[in-house]
Amino acid sequence: MHNPTPRTESPSALAFIKRFFAAEAAGGLILMAAALAALIVANSPLADSYFAALHTVLAGMSVEHWINDGLMAIFFMLVGLEIKREMLAGQLASWSQRALPGFAALGGMVVPALIYVAFNWGQPDTIGGWAIPAATDIAFALGVLSLLGKRVPLSLKIFLSALAILDDLGAVLIIALFYTSDLSIPMLLAALGSIAVLVALNRLSVKKLLPYLIVGALLWFFMLQSGIHATLAGVALALCIPLGKPDEEASSPLLHLEEKLHPWVAFAVVPVFGFANAGVSLSGITVDKLLDPVPLGVALGLLIGKQVGIFALAALAIRAGLARLPDGSNWGQLYGVAALCGIGFTMSLFIGALAFPGAPELVDEVKVGVLIGSVLSALLGVVVLRRFGARG
């Protein structure tokens, strides 16, 4: 009897897999697939099992809370590492480099929030969601941008990355200042003590990551119990991890941790979050429902507010001589990138869950608004960039 030899991947197939996971678009594409899968499952016979699994309690918290409070702390730690690296040695290391993405990020947070507030003014139950459309999903946006290939100059990708870093910094500050529940003073003091230990480790030039990670885990627990959102522990930990000197890049604790975390966050943490949070039943969604203040404010905040706010303030900074267009780009491409920034998936859904705790119907409305606004923003951005990329 013939025994077939075990199947092995061909060199070309392995090369393709490596290229796929190395591509900028890969993380965004996997997140898109996870979100689509969640929508399909939530509107299939498996819906009851899907929602029951998310609400299963493990060690005192539901699976959904473990994902949003636990796994997302790892996401926020990577965000913190990227912010610190870019501020100290990257695309945001000088004021001149910060000018264009800084003005753009400011406009991209303020105008969407104002649009949401305009639709929800006088609605005490929903006005608290004003920050939902103020966020940009860097994985989605860069994923879509990368699919356009050489139509988009590298300088625009760098601009989008820098803008998203500042956008994330703004979102972190918003969460810390506006979405903090009743505080437990003893746990808050314990959290502050943990941060003091992390700062001391940094000042003592401790290079090993293990002490930071142990204290960081304690910080996460104390923040979880204190009333401050536990994910902010990831940011605080990241900001205390040393970058090192420019000539010590190979031994940099920050760069080493960022390199190790990035694939886990891109290909595991964020897709799991997307699958757990994008699932919404569309059976009760009508045109009237879509015109409710929350989904309308979120969708238009992302679709209109992002592109108007980013492009207007970026143009103002350029015209005033405070910044200049990214090298090799044109005004049309800048507008296309501004439109892409209306993709607000991960952070928008995250803030939506914080804004409306205990109100699942409002969270579902947020999901619908985020999905509509993000998809339309992606389509608009692609159309504009294809139109102006050929000429740019």
Curated annotation (Swiss-Prot):
Superkingdom, natural source: Bacteria
> One MF term in GO for this entry?
sodium:proton antiporter activity
List the InterPro entries.
Answer: Na/H_antiporter_dom_sf, NhaA
Record Gene3D superfamilies: Na+/H+ antiporter like domain
> Could you provide one GO biological process annotation from this protein's UniProt record?
regulation of pH
> Where found in the cell?
Cell inner membrane
What does the record give as the reaction this protein catalyses? Na(+)(in) + 2 H(+)(out) = Na(+)(out) + 2 H(+)(in)
Q: Gene Ontology cellular component?
A: plasma membrane
Q: According to Swiss-Prot or TrEMBL, what is its membrane topology?
A: Multi-pass membrane protein
Pfam family membership, one: Na_H_antiport_1
Query: Any idea which UniProt keywords this protein has?
Result: Antiport, Cell inner membrane, Cell membrane, Ion transport, Membrane, Sodium, Sodium transport, Transmembrane, Transmembrane helix, Transport
Record field: transmembrane? 20-40, 63-83, 99-119, 127-147, 158-178, 181-201, 209-229, 265-285, 298-318, 336-356, 365-385
Family note: Belongs to the NhaA Na(+)/H(+) (TC 2.A.33) antiporter family.
Q: What does this protein do?
A: Na(+)/H(+) antiporter that extrudes sodium in exchange for external protons.
UniProt-listed HAMAP family = NhaA
Name of the molecule in the record: Na(+)/H(+) antiporter NhaA 2
The species is Pseudomonas savastanoi pv. phaseolicola (strain 1448A / Race 6) (Pseudomonas syringae pv. phaseolicola (strain 1448A / Race 6))
Query: By which gene is this protein encoded?
Result: nhaA2
